[in-house]
Amino acid sequence: MEKIKVALVSLGCDKNRIDSELMLYKLNEEAELVKNPKEAQVIIVNTCGFIETAKEESINTILQMASYKKTHNCKVLVVTGCLTQRYKGELKELIPEMDIMLGVNDYDKLLESIKVFLKSGEKSFYHKYSDTKINEGNRILTTPTYTAYVRIAEGCNNFCTYCAIPRIRGKYRSRKKENILKEVENLAKQGVKEIILIAQDTTMYGIDIYGKKVLHELLRDISKVEGVKWIRLLYCYPEEITKELIEEIKNNDKVCKYLDLPIQQISNSVLKRMGRKTTKETIIDIIKKLRKEIEGITLRTSLIVGFPGETEGEFSELKEFVSDVKLDKLGVFKYSKEEGTSAALMEEQIDEEIKEKREEEIMILQQSISKDINKEKIGKIYEVIVEGTKEDMYYGRNYEMSPEIDGEIYFEKDENVKIGDIIKVKVTHSLEYDLIGVVYNELSK
């Protein structure tokens, strides 16, 4: 293929981002990558098909990119990702402007499909489903140079009643430890300091290929890689957290004292309807254990409000939990009715207006909790990875903050500080979600 200009628009989660980065590497061999789709002759949209708002964003983006065939330089429109895997037949009819459609296991066909279309105009529509294939290999990072996401497993075995991911991504399958370590070593050589481990469920890592959960072993091995400073864990199911994992987080200085626990709900009756393999008592017990065993640990969660049949009593129970447990970070999603899931067939679907009201109530409550938690940080000194500048301030994150979702620490510019540096910052002021401080040195003690 001649050096044709290609742009890739990536939507959705960071697992999708990794797929996009894998595609970019393959494309870079024979194409010129451009950031602005208006300049591109080939536009690739990597879609999300998880919840209704994500699907709408994906459809709107595809249609916008399709319009560039008339208004700009686009000759080939490629659509891939979770939406194409989930709605392959419907999309083909709905958007005839698509020239190539790939499922989540078809990225190896990307270059060849583009070449064929440019040569003959022949369209390609692949949507292979695989319970064995794992997308891995070299990537072109779309994150800042000091941070990278690393997927340790693909798919999911949980089959929660509201979630379509197992039907899109297949059953849970772990990557081999040696492949992950090789990837981390390559990333560290590129200057990456923060490794963020992701999967649909990171805590189940290894169960399928090693016969047991070995996330703690993986953390230990990654921490030995030269250049890696921080290792962050996302998507840790509380019921799967082992004592070995707790010990590793506690004793390994490179592992951030931070856990993302997607509990979704707290009422046992709602958890049962959701098909979750846990209980209120188990969730509260593991939170207490983590706080007792790991000093200074930050706990984040995501909640779903408006699940079918959610009563005022069940919602009050959730509010009481949020108020009593006071998790450090919290996000709320309104339940999204997804085709093909058993929850979509449940009676007593909740009105959108009630969902919005409940979402707002939880977030107002959490805002107050976060404000109080942040006040306690005044005077504390943190290691901060410097991310950028806004007006006359630098900003960055400490171990308590995951990229893009957890707030930032702002501090005055310092001529000795560069983006990507890890420095010490003393907190002087606090806001609801952000902190303000000064570079910590002899003068700021």
From Swiss-Prot:
It is an enzyme of class 2 (transferase). Disulfide bonds: none annotated. Its EC number is 2.8.4.4. It catalyses: L-aspartate(89)-[ribosomal protein uS12]-hydrogen + (sulfur carrier)-SH + AH2 + 2 S-adenosyl-L-methionine = 3-methylsulfanyl-L-aspartate(89)-[ribosomal protein uS12]-hydrogen + (sulfur carrier)-H + 5'-deoxyadenosine + L-methionine + A + S-adenosyl-L-homocysteine + 2 H(+). One of its GO terms (biological process) is tRNA modification. Residues 142-372 form the Radical SAM core domain. Binds 2 [4Fe-4S] clusters. One cluster is coordinated with 3 cysteines and an exchangeable S-adenosyl-L-methionine. [4Fe-4S] cluster 2 binds at C156, C160, C163. Belongs to the methylthiotransferase family. RimO subfamily. This is Ribosomal protein uS12 methylthiotransferase RimO. The gene is rimO.
